[in-house]
């Protein structure tokens, strides 16, 4: 399973998260990447911790490199966590 597949699977298994295809975050100058909306009332730090645990449990390769540079933005009352190293 690739890192992108793992993110998609994890989000699909957890209703408090939602995929954001083609997100362009701060400093990306129009480049697009994969993002995840963490709904209001949920911690984006918990999302990251649990996502990395999910990847470890599923033996996902190259997770460190692909997750490097992950950032977040406010999205109304939600938060979007985005991964510039993962195309969208």
Task: Annotate each language-model stretch with its function.
Residues 2-16, 51-55:
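Short amphipathic alpha-helix segments
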Residues 20-88:
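Acidic, low-complexity, intrinsically disordered interaction modules
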Residues 1-2, 42:
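Short coil/turn linker and secondary-structure boundary residues
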């Amino acid at each position: 399973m690739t890192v992108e597949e793992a993110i998609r699977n994890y989000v699909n298994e957890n209703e408090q998260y939602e995929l954001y295809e083609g997100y362009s975050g701060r400093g990306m100058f129009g480049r697009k990447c994969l993002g995840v909306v963490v709904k209001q009332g949920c911690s984006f730090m918990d999302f990251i911790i649990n996502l990395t645990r999910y990847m470890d449990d599923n033996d996902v390769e190259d997770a460190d490199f692909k997750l490097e540079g992950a950032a977040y933005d406010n999205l109304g009352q939600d938060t979007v966590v985005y991964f510039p190293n993962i195309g969208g």
